[in-house]
Amino acid sequence: MKKTLVLMLSVVMALSLLAGCGSRGAPAESDVIKIGVFEPMTGANAAGGEMTVEGIQLANEKMPEILGKKVELVIVDNKSDKVEAANAANKLIEQDKVVAIIGSYGSSLSMAAGDIVKTAQVPAVGCSPTNPLVTLNNDFYFRVCFIDPFQGTVMANYAFNELGARTAAIIQDVQQDYSVGLSKYFVDAFTELTGDPNSIVATVSYNTGDQDFSAQLTSVKGLNPDVIFAPGNYGESALLIKQARDLGMDTPILGGDTWEAPEFLSIGGAAVEGAVFSTHFTSEAPVTEVSEVFLADYQAKYGKAANAFAALGYDAYMVILDAIERAGSADSVAIQQALAETEGFVGATGNITLDENGDAVKSAVINKVEGGKFVYLTTVEP
């Protein structure tokens, strides 16, 4: 009898162990689908992360279920730091067991998670990381925004055609892949327009978090360029422009999409009047019926006009849910395959088709600071 009991217990334990092994990496069916979000809620990029998350949360309220299951957002602060971004992505995958990830504002932060999502085979959709390297050779990273070769060309064309600029200086943040990359694409396009490789009279650098730009600005001032291109975080860029005006420089200063933040206006004050930058979307020129709905819902929820990053966050969430619905599954690989086939999805920021690199081909908006506000100038098609 004792031998029989021991044998039965051994069989039960063996079956339990086998069941445990079988469930590892393949959690049981749940009534909840978890989507991870890793955005900078603190640090140098906090304003961008906060705007993006507002759009994601609005989309989740608008569409809280898919395939008859509740969609739960798991939001982790990547603290505007590359190491923290990698840690956040790991946590979402290993601990929270998300089936897809949204993020991140800041190309460097997205790139920090690239190998992680690729190895784990959990798809990520970036809202606004514009550096081409984010999705390069990574079938599990997608984005709903344009990329920097286009953005740099848009601003080079503006400088050359609208401002009549024939010389330019570059002031870049060497710690940000976004800033260095976008500067390069501006230079490529601008020198092609001028036909003169010497039309870039200077390229000077600073580091994220710097507060004093007097050395860089003084060196540029002496060269008297027709325009300055200075893509960087909204905080440093606003300070840079303010100090340029304090030095008596009236050279037009252009930037990229990261300038679209309330803090750019509050830090820069009157000094940033006339600043021109490229971005992804404007509430002044809705492009689809979904844009209209998004703008109304955003205003109702937050009591303010929507911005480009909220719109992109909204679209990233909706694109993932569309992929889940088309896949008929919340399996990560199935979602990735459906994302790769996204074509003609109507979003708040426009019609979204993801190309062979996982990139969206989108128009760009050019805004100008006038009267302490961001004012729409024009839309540029790819």
Whereabouts are the PLM-identified features?
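Short, low-complexity disordered leader/linker segments with a strong preference
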Residues: 1-34, 65-66, 380-382
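Beta-alpha junction/loop-to-helix N-cap segments that form part of ligand/metal-binding clefts
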Residues: 24-28, 32, 47-52, 62-135, ...
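Extracytoplasmic "Venus flytrap"
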Residues: 36-55, 63, 76-83, 105-106, ...
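Hydrophobic alpha-helical segments within soluble ligand-binding/sensing domains
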Residues: 85, 144-168, 180-182, 212-214, ...
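An alpha-beta-alpha
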Residues: 141-204, 227, 320
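Extracellular/periplasmic bilobed ligand-binding domains
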Residues: 184-280
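Extracellular/periplasmic periplasmic-binding protein-like sensory domains
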Residues: 241-314, 370, 374-381
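Segments of small-molecule ligand-sensing domains
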Residues: 300-307, 321-373
